[in-house]
Amino acid sequence: MTEYEFSAELVFWGDALDSKRLADDLHLTVTQSRVKGEPLRRPDGTDSGSVAKTGMLSCECSSQDASLRRDPEGQLRVALGALKRLAGPLRKTYGVADAELQINVYYRDKTGGDPDFMFPSELLDLLVQHRIELRITVLP
């Protein structure tokens, strides 16, 4: 059987993005957040001399449960639950201009056909409703 890890993240961008409110409503672990015009920091915490051109919020769908790293459907259910908690339309309520559900599948061995998983239809409906693009990347 092929060893793989699955990573799903919801990523939001917008000049008027209310990342604090959005993160609070999603109840997911924030992996990155920045506010338009805020100084960008290097990994060591020092000022890079640049400022964020737009707001951004990235949240992962697996960090609260390590067993989800190999459970695509589990992570998609986490994303579904997070989107169901939203108080209203992304653009109007949170200032979101663009959004993606980013999915990465990392394989140790290249074997076609693994993993096999289903997208919950209710998740797909919410992605369309909120105009969230779906991006899938498969990496060796």
Q: Model regions: which residues?
A:
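Acidic (Asp/Glu-rich) sequence patches and key acidic residues
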Residues: 1-138
